[in-house]
Amino acid sequence: MTGPTLLSLATAVPENRHRQMEIHDRWLSPYIKSQRARAIFAAAEIETRHSVLAESGFLASEPGTKARNDLYMGAARPLATTAICQALLKAGLNSGDIDHFIVVSCTGFDNPGLDVILAGDLGMRSNLRRTALIGMGCHAGLTGLDRAMLELAARPEHHALVLAVEFGTLHFQHGSSLENMVAGALF
């Protein structure tokens, strides 16, 4: 007896591409006053990252959750749609074939949720089973895959779609705590 199978994988990234050390030097160094910060950013061994932010000005005013979330939702919908359509095409499926839709994020949320919005946009079935894993942090991606595995173990003839949408640069914080420096370097 075989278990669930991964049929495809797809990604979509924001168009703005920044070098890791540029993010430190131009975006964050005015707000993170620590000699260790540059070394932490270099040690992360990330060369480039994509961001919904074209430049650092957004972060200067320490924007609140609403401003950050508005940017998240504006970018999440088209990028998620692109990734989903690519994944479905690679798998030889259409949106109506999806039985379980699991959306994961710790960098944005809305009500109605991205799961409901995308299901409507993509014409998914009205009896679609949805799960939104919001605010769980780094392990949510694995939790989403686990949820899909559990659903498919119970219903092997079904198809599950797991979507993770994360825009970490939206949440850079001012301050020189070790936690803030590591989070800025990694996410």
Positions of predicted regions on the chain:
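Acyl-thioester C-C bond-transforming condensing/cleaving domain
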Residues: 1, 74, 80-96, 106-187
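Conserved active-site "lid/cap" helical segment
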Residues: 1-99
